[in-house]
Amino acid sequence: MQPKPELYSSHYAQWFKDPDVIAAYPSRPPYAEAAIQFLSELATDRPRRALDIGCGTGDIARRLAPLIDLVDAVDFSAGMIETGRHLPGGTASNVRWRIGAVEDVPLDPPYALVTAGESLHWMNWEVVLPRLADALSPHGSLAIVGRDWEGPPGVRTHIRPVLMRHSAVRVWQDVDLLSELQSRELFTVLGSRRFGPDPWEPTVEQYLECRHSQRSFARSAMGETAARAFDAELRQVLTELCVSGAIQCLSDTLQLSVETTVTWGRPPGGQNTR
């Protein structure tokens, strides 16, 4: 069995149980609306039931639910799920929140669609992928969903050094999740689409809060003094980018954008075959 890259260590996933990270998580930009619609179209088998793994606060699950029959939203962080219940769509009758690790939480297959929004990299692939293969319906798909809100190259060039100086994770690896899964023969890609850019207009403080929802900048991991220094430096860089025109600013909001990528396919094997 190939070891996972250190950057994807389950140790870092534990930070998503941290109350500060949970509180900051809703500040993340939403996945593109067109991507949510496309995910619903991937669920072709009847009944149109989906499983959202590592659902966090349910940005996918809550928005997918009106478009299909049922969504089981699973996360090992009780705090994330409790937050999701209180967000729009969180009390829908066809959203079933389940607290537990995907490796062993009770499931209710078959599922016409499994979604993994920026979550699969934290899991035990050798356990989870075969389990999903068994849980998928005959024409079901696993959709791996990601989003890019880092901005154009000119903006990234200025922000990246700040991120690297202050990151609580001191592991630098260029890792591609899909390549890792395919090299282990755990996932077969059937297609990929990119959606957006969609506008994202946070204030500077909302942008900083969004950064603190990431494992590398969790306040509890950074420490109070380091977190304040990070905020001050990044706030200064954002101000300079607004003044220079590299980032358009309207009133007190940053005129940014977010793109969403959906890559779908299927883990090999499984009890249900096409």
Regions found by a protein language model. Give the residues of each.
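A short, conserved alpha-helix within the catalytic core of class I
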Residues: 123-132
